[in-house]
């Protein structure tokens, strides 16, 4: 083949390759156009997903449904008008307590990222129940958990997570900087109360839907403190009790009426020889009932009830089935403070039913261990120690701690009454165990008028952790 023939042959091959490449490009363009035409045609056939979520936006609860159209999510919204929780129903009749939640936070925290906490409590809106807790700005099994037995520090914050979940950085919502706190929902928004600052001048910061709305300054300059459980709401108003003054003597106690995060009224209790701390409050038939801790001189629990105008009555639970810890053995009760083993105490609760009372208490008379619920049919007004029902919650060989009440409004349950519930803190670590930290998990129960069972639902974590060795 001479040189001219070689050139002609190579040129012909290049031309053929170029033509093939051009044909392929034209085919690619045609296929893209056809694919786009098919996709555009499918827009007339939207696929409706069954997923429905609840979100909070612009102070209005919004029901959102996602419609999947060509891989693009559009949101259709139907606003649900917010309605204030009435709070005027009576407590539901109950025969026992059904297990509601258990977070297993300490067990999971041995290998997972779980907050070091104490003072957990539960509060419910008309849509959900959340666990609130005071963190120590530290995780379990980490060096910053050292020394977290301390109650008040600038690192403590109020946070919340869905009920039954272990409190972690991944599921928790910041609420307030606080070493003492309360929270509740009025049917429209969340009210949070967080107390922080020095012992001689602490300030309570009130937030409504996450926005600061008011503050309350310590009026006795002696460790302003509040409930460590939910406040109580009815007809658009929420109510809380605060204490300022000695933990082992006469202190000052105030009831606050709060609307949309603003204090609209307060009254100081005229309660000589009474001691109120860490009250557990709930609405019942249009009034608020609070059962509290006497850290001064009572092994039975003081109570205060009041209406929306803050007109109040005070007393002590009369039953000889004593509810505090430490306490004497059950015996002769009193409608005033029972002084035997009356010093110190632990946060607790009771539910009043006419002349009767459900009493929650530790099983041990001297340490924060075990837990039980007792029904005393005459215990609110009579001083004997007889009772008719005892339900085991935590065995005496396992640690317990604080306990408190919460309620589920009819707007949440669909019942025509207020469902009584309670939570129990299960404290682990210092000062009773050989660790560098103090934390806790929690369990909760709700009252039912059907079958229940007594058992033990302990924390269950095996200590010490790696950080403790």
From Swiss-Prot:
Q: Does the keyword Manganese apply?
A: no
Subcellular location as annotated:
Virion membrane; Host apical cell membrane
Where Ca(2+) is bound, by residue? 294, 298, 324
The record lists substrate as bound by 118, 152, 277-278, 293, 368
Q: Where is this region: Head of neuraminidase?
A: 91-469
**Any Gene Ontology biological process:** viral budding from plasma membrane
**Names of required cofactors:** Ca(2+)
Q: Which positions does UniProt annotate with glycan attachment? A: 50, 58, 63, 68, 88, 146, 235
The EC number of this protein is 3.2.1.18
A cellular component term (GO) from this record?
A: virion membrane
Q: Where is the active site?
A: 151, 402
The residue ranges for the Intravirion side of the membrane come to 1-6
Q: Enumerate the GO terms in the molecular function aspect.
A: exo-alpha-sialidase activity; metal ion binding
Q: Where is this region: Hypervariable stalk region?
A: 36-90
CDD domains in alphabetical order:
Influenza_NA
Instruction: Show the disulfide pairing.
Output: 92-417, 124-129, 184-231, 233-238, 279-292, 281-290, 318-335, 421-446
Keywords in alphabetical order: Calcium, Disulfide bond, Glycoprotein, Glycosidase, Host cell membrane, Host membrane, Hydrolase, Membrane, Metal-binding, Signal-anchor, Transmembrane, Transmembrane helix, Virion
Q: How would you describe this protein's topology in the membrane?
A: Single-pass type II membrane protein
Report if keyword Protein transport is assigned.
no
> In what way is this protein post-translationally modified?
N-glycosylated.
Q: What is written about domains in the entry's comments?
A: Intact N-terminus is essential for virion morphogenesis. Possesses two apical sorting signals, one in the ectodomain, which is likely to be a glycan, and the other in the transmembrane domain. The transmembrane domain also plays a role in lipid raft association.
Similarity comment text for this entry? Belongs to the glycosyl hydrolase 34 family.
- Subunit composition? Homotetramer.
The record's function comment reads:
Catalyzes the removal of terminal sialic acid residues from viral and cellular glycoconjugates. Cleaves off the terminal sialic acids on the glycosylated HA during virus budding to facilitate virus release. Additionally helps virus spread through the circulation by further removing sialic acids from the cell surface. These cleavages prevent self-aggregation and ensure the efficient spread of the progeny virus from cell to cell. Otherwise, infection would be limited to one round of replication.
Remarks, anything else? The influenza A genome consist of 8 RNA segments. Genetic variation of hemagglutinin and/or neuraminidase genes results in the emergence of new influenza strains. The mechanism of variation can be the result of point mutations or the result of genetic reassortment between segments of two different strains.
What name appears for this protein in its UniProt entry? Neuraminidase
Name of the encoding gene = NA
């Amino acid at each position: 083949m001479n040189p001219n023939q070689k050139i002609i042959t190579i040129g012909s091959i290049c031309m053929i390759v170029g033509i093939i490449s051009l044909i392929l490009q034209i085919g690619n363009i045609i296929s893209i156009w056809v694919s786009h035409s098919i996709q555009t045609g499918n827009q007339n056939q939207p696929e409706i997903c069954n997923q429905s979520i609840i979100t909070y936006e612009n102070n209005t609860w919004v029901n959102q449904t996602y419609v999947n159209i060509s891989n693009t999510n559009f949101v259709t919204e139907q606003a649900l008008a917010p309605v204030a929780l009435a709070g005027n129903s009576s407590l539901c009749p109950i025969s026992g307590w059904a297990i509601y939640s258990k977070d297993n936070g300490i067990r999971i925290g041995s290998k997972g990222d779980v907050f070091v906490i104490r003072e957990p409590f539960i509060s419910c809106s008309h849509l959900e129940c959340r666990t609130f807790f005071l963190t120590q700005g530290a995780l379990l099994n980490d060096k910053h958990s050292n020394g977290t037995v301390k109650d008040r520090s600038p690192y403590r914050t109020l946070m919340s997570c869905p009920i039954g979940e272990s409190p972690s950085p991944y599921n928790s919502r910041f609420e307030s900087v606080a070493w003492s706190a309360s929270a509740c929902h009025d049917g429209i928004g969340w009210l949070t109360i967080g107390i922080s600052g020095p012992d001689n001048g602490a300030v309570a910061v009130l937030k409504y839907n996450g926005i600061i709305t008011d503050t309350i300054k310590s009026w006795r300059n002696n460790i302003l403190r509040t409930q460590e459980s939910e406040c109580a709401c009815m007809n658009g108003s929420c109510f809380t009790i605060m204490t300022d003054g000695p933990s082992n003597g006469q202190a000052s106690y105030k009831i606050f009426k709060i609307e949309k995060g603003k204090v609209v009224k307060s009254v100081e209790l005229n309660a000589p020889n009474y001691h109120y701390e860490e009250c557990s409050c709930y609405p019942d038939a249009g009034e608020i009932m609070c059962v509290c801790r006497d850290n001064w001189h009572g092994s039975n629990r003081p109570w205060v009830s009041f209406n929306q105008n803050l007109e109040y009555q005070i007393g002590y639970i009369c039953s000889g089935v004593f509810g505090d810890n430490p306490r004497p053995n059950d015996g002769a009760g009193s409608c005033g403070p029972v002084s035997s083993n009356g010093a110190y105490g632990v946060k607790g609760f009771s539910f009043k039913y006419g002349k009767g009372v459900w009493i929650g208490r530790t099983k041990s008379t001297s340490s924060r261990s075990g837990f039980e619920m007792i029904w005393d049919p005459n215990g609110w007004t009579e001083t004997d120690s007889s009772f008719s029902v005892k339900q085991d919650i935590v065995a005496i060989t396992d640690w317990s701690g604080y306990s408190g009440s919460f309620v589920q409004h009819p707007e949440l349950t669909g019942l025509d009454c207020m469902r009584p519930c309670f939570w129990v803190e299960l404290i682990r670590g210092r000062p009773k165990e050989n660790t560098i930290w103090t934390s806790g998990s929690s369990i909760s129960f709700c009252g039912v008028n059907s079958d229940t069972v007594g058992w033990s639902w302990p924390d269950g974590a095996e200590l010490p952790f790696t950080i403790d060795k």
